[in-house]
Amino acid sequence: MNEQAVLAPWPEHERTSSVLFNNVPCAVLVPFIKNAGGLDLLFEVRSKTLRWQPGDISFPGGKIEARDVTPLAAAIRETGEELNIPPEKIRVLASLAPLETVTGVTLNPFVAEVSSVEDIRCTAEVDHTFTVPLQWFMEHEPELAEMDLATRPGATFPVDIPYAGNPMEWRRRKTYFVYIYRYEGYRIWGMTAQIVKECIDIIKAM
């Protein structure tokens, strides 16, 4: 692995707008940290008191707000708000193609080098942070697990319209796969793992 190539600007990837209606635009930072042992990826564990995905592992980021000039601005702002990392400690390396989630989110990932972890202070949204050596990801393939996308009638669905099957049961519409990395008791999965997998594929091709 060529660490100098990893920390140089990455090739541009085509960015396209969402093809789904009513998606929530979000942005995340994918932070690389250089230390004596090599390069690490920084992750955060979401607070267990949050209503949305409590305790999940993610990259710093969140919803793109009206005050954000660009998706990148949102990723940097959210990183500062969640981990107290100032913009001057962030050097952007690449913007990856947006990802569409089945939960109605368009996720804009930005790869960056964070020059120091001394400033990291977790806010109420973050339980704690941890790092994983980049080399570990280079040497370990993720697991693949099936997820079912399903629907059932809501409370206001008209009773005079027939619905096949038990209205209280979920009806499977589509099966898709998610990546899972297991590292020292941590389970990195879903969109976060998909972003990691894309980064590793790009780095291996450098």
Regions found by a protein language model. Give the residues of each.
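Short, charged, solvent-exposed linker or helix-capping segments at domain edges/interfaces
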Residues: 119-124, 141-142
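N-terminal leader/linker segments that precede catalytic domains of diphosphate-processing enzymes
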Residues: 1-58, 63-109, 113-118, 126, ...
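Flexible glycine-rich active-site/ligand-binding loops centered on an Asp-His dyad
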Residues: 129-131
